[in-house]
Regions:
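A short aromatic-anchored loop/beta-hairpin motif
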Residues: 2, 21, 33-222
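N-terminal secretory signal peptides that target proteins for export/translocation
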Residues: 1-16
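Bacterial N-terminal signal peptides
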Residues: 12-17, 21-37
Length: 222
């Protein structure tokens, strides 16, 4: 199987490259990519100086869509073309890094440990995203904000398993996407609030507390 590389500034568009296979425990193909928001929706673009990229989007109690109830989303991109983010508080299991590397045909010797796998959102659930702390820099690493980055090079997987990768990381399957102006409309309707992101919340493995911690940060900001 192969790997997709797709990192672009501003609105992100997937450029077809190699596609990456993943171990059966994930039951999906892992494709590390940054994507645009879903088509459709309102037509009012986000102001250039109001980007939420690198921040956390937190569902309010008014949001009753079961796909997003009490979700915390790390925003990857947000501009006039739409918005895209990853749900970070819906873990679905773990995957052995060595098994994943074997699926990729990569050398798994000297590799140990697991990656925490999350439900990243309802859009394109066959795509995967590696989110990690920004002290690691590979060939295709892109720092999004809040000390958080994404890397499209599969070498990040081996680095994580060999102990030379980022301090903290997670794997998300699928993403949340918004058309131009759609997210702004949902925020005005009181369905979301945004707060500053940091690794303590993003990579907190106590998913039951992430939403509460993020909402508490909103109170502090106010």
């Amino acid at each position: 199987m192969h790997f997709i590389r797709a990192f672009r500034s501003g609105a992100k568009r997937v450029r077809r490259g190699r596609i990456l296979g993943v171990a059966p425990v994930v039951a999906a193909m892992l494709v590390v990519a940054i994507c645009t928001g879903a088509p459709g929706g309102a037509a009012v673009p986000a102001p250039k100086d109001a980007s939420l990229a690198g921040r956390l989007l937190v569902a309010t109690p008014d949001l009753t869509d079961p796909r997003f109830v009490q979700t915390v989303i790390f925003m990857v991109s947000h501009d006039a073309s739409g918005a895209m983010g990853l749900v970070i508080n819906r873990p679905i299991g773990r995957i052995a890094i060595a098994a994943l590397l074997k699926q990729l045909g990569e050398d798994s010797r000297g590799v140990d440990g697991e990656l925490l796998v999350h439900y990243g959102g309802p859009v394109e659930p066959m795509q995967g995203f590696v989110l990690h702390t920004a002290e690691y820099a590979g060939v295709d690493t892109r720092v999004v904000g809040g000390g958080i980055a994404l890397t499209s090079d599969p070498k990040v997987l081996r680095a994580i398993g060999a102990g030379s990768g980022p301090r903290r990381s997670l794997l998300a399957l699928g993403y949340a996407g918004w058309a131009p102006g759609q997210l702004e409309a949902e925020i005005r309707s009181g369905h979301w609030v945004d707060v500053q992101a940091d690794e303590k919340i993003v990579f907190d493995e106590n998913a039951d507390k992430q939403w509460e911690r993020a909402m508490a940060r909103r109170v502090i900001q106010l």
